[in-house]
From Swiss-Prot:
Residues 18-90, 95-166, 206-281 form the RRM domain. This is Flowering time control protein FPA. Induction: Negative feedback mediated by FPA itself. Transmembrane segments: none annotated. One of its GO terms (molecular function) is RNA binding. It comes from Arabidopsis thaliana (Mouse-ear cress). One of its GO terms (biological process) is flower development.
Length: 901
């Protein structure tokens, strides 16, 4: 037994009280048994029995009577058990008072006025025939002061005021309040006096006991409760006790109460936790209460605050027959097929008409759900695979927002940040409008592919530009705190809100709303164009971040994020793929993470770009390769076909020695693309057009090693075919270094259409692991070319994870003849022949210099850096050709020293 229930012992402290604690009671002991036994010693004000705990409290009017009963009945046998009697410990101070000994001349108003002097009263219940009242204060200090009324005379009698017993006695106070204080106790079992006391049912009566959880705030309002039950018959009185989580409803007859109980059991306000059972006690009369709803003076729940005016439903204007018209329009209606055994089937409630001549169907009204067939019920919507076992049955069912028929007009964008709607403020929309004139979408909201409810989308301000699909599927969730961080970097956002499209969708809509709120999450839905829509429940994110008035709605938010900075080489890699642009993000993201991306596909960022930027994604051999950029196209250096042909012609066809020279180091990285050429401009003797069409060729070296080459060929028009969609695989032969790039690789910059010059075969030696462009047959020694090593960060900046063959340093150039050289022969200097007919003067190679200086100026720092890297690439090629020509001129009169076979 609880500590607060332990009695005082008279022999310990000499304490005496008119309140007796009686213990060792059997579970079968009833209030009538105690009344019969203890009523012999005096008038009893109240008896409170706790059968499950084996004790009771008995309140005598006078202390002397309590003392006499204790001495006479100590150890008496009651229902086979010897009872123990002690003086009860005083009740702990609380906000609830019990007032007894009220004289017959004291009215309810007089008593309430007297006790209201001590503070604001939350609930006042006066039971005249029992000469008892129960008073609940908002503050405990007020109740402590009102306790001083104990023993004060009023109306010819002395008041007895005491605190109600903590929790348990407070729950069962109605058991005593309905007892006959003069000892003429009834023998009927009492109904449960709190929501937790629900254990069973009793015989049918015209009074219904409604037990509800604290979250069911609709039951606190007697007007709403009346409107929900009036369809079943004439209601004499309604009394709600919010602090005790139950209400009493008295019908005109027991038959009407039975119909109401059967029709609303588990379906009242769409809350299965609300329990309805009979009460054999009549609702206490309130002769001094002139209002029909005594509880209407209390403040209603604020669940309807800030809501616009509601259009009443077809059944809110009146009820046929003897039923009185509904008194308000803030009612709820649940009549959807979700709660029928067959979709579309109308409810089957029927009740006798007022004149008894026929049967009238009970129309669907506010707060009433159709009664499904016995044993049948649609399963709750759930998809554990996508939403971590989302079980609506585990959610705490709270109050439901009022739903109205007609269009969703009157919802003005109150307090929304102006940047959410672009430029300027948005004027408030009219409060009234034609039906369905303000919604921009009607469709289905789904969770993980499972339909949740039909809904309408209403814009706030300008709404969203993206067209919503027929089904908005929430495939993932995201934390609201993370969403707030993304909002901080967004350049704007678009806001809408969703409301149930039909009455039967309201339950599942609210359930989904409560689920997101309880998890502090927002649903993530991918739209058809790749835009991400966030479904945000009522939360602090709305009020603190979006500056939107918080209401019980599901909001849709689309963030406008700045486009990420895409490097040139990254854009080029995307353009080199055969898939369209809008598949890039899908291929990059895994299926589980695709719906979480906040950035739409990159095609959204180039909607206004020229047509050639998007057309470049299609592989073509007849158009030059173009590198897209987010900015406007810049005027860059363009090498004409004639100049490129000249550049190819000045490169000798045989291997010649070259001494180490000092060159300007390459200041930036270059983009590596895949090509292959033949030194004479043909592919194995074929015409260029035929060479374009050839597939991959397998070239074998002396060590019988092979690798893939692509038969791309230089054309007079100076055009390049699109590069392959992937890099050639590196060979596993130990003679190849991990950093080798095959002969089908060349340098390519952002805005130059560079043609292929000559083929570069494979090199089966680990001292030379990277080939540069050009068809020169003059090998350059390793120390000279090592000065042109690219920056170590170049591969990571351009391509992310880089294959091993792409991470090596640039070591030198070689020729077709280098295939058969051993390491010692290959490192030997090769001198070009003196009779090379197609050598050009040195100034031909210098022609590249003025063209390099003509590179266009970038509009941003990133583009300037790209242009500088591009210039460095061309500078490297020009310097390399210049050094080769210088060596040719210096050694033209000498004899070659160590020419290869």
């Amino acid at each position: 037994m609880a500590l607060s229930m332990k009695p005082f012992r008279a022999d310990d402290s000499g304490f005496q009280s008119n309140n007796l604690w009686v213990g060792s009671l059997t579970p079968e002991t009833t209030e009538s048994d105690l009344t019969e036994l203890f009523g012999r010693y005096g008038d009893i004000d109240r008896i409170t029995v706790y059968s499950s705990r084996g004790f009771a409290f008995i309140y005598y009017r006078h202390v002397e009577e309590a003392v006499a009963a204790k001495e006479a009945l100590q150890g008496a046998n009651l229902n086979g058990s010897q009872i123990k009697i002690e003086y009860a410990r005083p009740a702990k101070p609380c906000k609830s008072l019990w007032v007894g000994g009220i004289g017959p001349n004291v009215s309810k108003d007089d008593l309430e006025e007297e006790f209201s002097k001590f503070g604001k009263i939350e609930d006042f219940r006066f039971l005249r025939e029992r000469k008892t009242a129960f008073i609940d204060y908002y503050e405990m200090d007020d109740a402590l002061q009102a306790k001083s009324m104990n023993g004060k005379p009023m109306g010819g009698s002395f008041l007895r005021v005491d605190f109600l017993r903590s929790q348990a006695p407070k729950k069962e106070q109605w058991a005593g309040s309905y007892d006959n204080r003069n000892g003429n106790m009834n023998h009927k079992p009492q109904y449960p006096h709190s929501y937790e006391d629900f254990k069973g049912d009793v015989q049918p009566s015209k009074v219904l006991w409604i037990g509800f959880p604290p979250t069911a705030t609709q039951c606190n309002d007697e007007q709403i409760l009346h409107n929900a039950m009036i369809l079943f018959g004439e209601i004499e009185r309604v009394k709600s006790y919010p602090s005790r989580n139950f209400a009493l409803v008295e019908f005109r007859s027991a038959e009407e109460a039975r119909q109401c109980k059967e029709g609303l059991q588990g379906r009242l306000f769409n809350n299965p936790r609300i329990k309805i059972m009979y009460s054999n006690d009549e609702l206490p009369p309130e002769q001094d209460d002139t209002s029909f709803y005594s509880g209407m003076k209390r403040s209603r729940t604020d669940m309807f605050n800030n809501d616009p005016s509601f259009v009443s439903s077809p059944h809110s204007t009146g009820i046929p027959g003897s039923m009185r018209p509904l008194r308000g329009t803030n009612e709820r209606s649940y009549n959807g097929a979700e709660y029928n055994d067959v979709v579309g089937k109308e409810p089957n409630w029927r009740r006798p008409s007022a004149n008894g001549t026929g049967i009238l169907p009970s129309p669907t009204g506010p707060g009433i759900l159709p009664s499904p067939a016995q044993g049948t019920r649609r399963p709750m919507r759930s998809n554990p695979d996508s939403w971590e076992g989302y079980d609506p049955a585990q959610l705490v069912r709270e109050s439901k927002r009022t739903r109205r028929d007609g269009s969703v007009d009157g919802f003005t964008p109150m307090g929304v940040d102006e940047r959410s709607f672009g430029r300027g403020s948005v004027a408030a929309r009219p409060i009234r409008g034609p039906p369905d004139s303000d919604h921009i979408w009607r469709g289905m909201i789904a969770k993980g592919g499972t339909p949740v409810c039909c809904a309408r989308c209403v814009p706030m301000g300008k709404g969203i530009e993206t067209k919503l699909p027929e089904v908005v599927n929430c495939s993932a969730r995201t934390d609201l705190n993370m969403l707030a961080k993304h909002y901080a970097v967004a350049i704007g956002c678009e806001i809408v809100f969703f409301v149930p499209d039909r009455e039967e969708d309201f339950a599942s809509y609210t359930e989904f709303l409560r689920y997101l709120s309880s998890k502090d999450r927002a649903g993530v839905a991918k739209l058809d164009d790749g835009t991400t829509l966030f479904l945000v429940p009522p939360s602090d994110f709305l009020t603190d971040v979006l500056q939107v008035t918080r209401q019980e709605r599901l909001y849709g938010v689309v963030l406008k994020l700045p486009p990420p900075a895409v490097p040139v080489t990254a854009s080029y890699r995307q353009e080199s793929q055969s898939n369209p642009l809008h598949y890039m993000d899908q291929a990059r993201d895994s299926p589980a993470n695709a719906s979480h991306s906040l950035y739409p596909p990159r095609e959204n960022y180039i909607r206004g770009a020229p047509e050639h930027l998007t057309a470049a994604s299609k592989p073509s051999v007849s158009e030059p390769l173009r590198i897209p950029n987010n900015a406007a196209p810049q005027a860059g250096v363009s090498l004409t076909p004639e100049l490129l042909a000249t550049l190819a012609s000045i490169l000798p066809a045989t291997s010649q020695p070259a001494a180490p020279e000092s060159h300007q180091p390459m200041s930036g990285p270059s983009t590596v693309v895949s090509t292959a050429h033949q030194s004479n401009g043909l592919y194995n003797g074929e015409a260029p057009s035929q060479a374009w069409k050839r597939g991959p060729q397998t070239v074998h070296d002396a060590s019988n090693q092979s690798f893939q080459q692509y038969g791309n060929q230089y054309t007079p028009a100076g055009q390049l075919p699109p590069p392959p969609s992937r890099y050639p695989p590196a060979s596993n032969n130990p003679n190849y270094t991990s950093g080798m790039v095959h002969g089908n690789m060349q340098y390519q910059s952002q805005s130059v259409n560079m043609p292929q010059l000559s083929p570069l075969p494979n090199m089966p030696h680990n001292n030379y692991s990277m080939y540069t462009q050009g068809s020169s047959n003059h090998p350059v020694s390793q120390p000279m070319v090592q000065q042109y090593q690219p920056e170590a960060s170049m591969p990571n900046q351009n391509y992310g994870p880089i294959p091993s063959y792409q991470q090596a340093n640039f070591h030198g150039v070689t020729t077709n003849q280098a295939q058969n050289l051993n390491p010692s022969q290959f490192q030997a200097a090769m001198q070009p022949p003196a009779d090379k007919a197609n050598l050009e003067p040195q100034n031909q190679a210098l022609r590249l210099q003025p063209m390099i200086s003509g590179d266009g100026q970038g509009t941003t720092d990133g583009e300037v850096d790209k242009n500088q890297r591009y210039q460095s690439t061309l500078q490297f090629a020009a310097n390399l050709l210049l050094q080769i020509q210088q060596k040719q001129q210096q050694q033209s009169s000498g004899t070659p020293a160590g020419q290869g076979p």
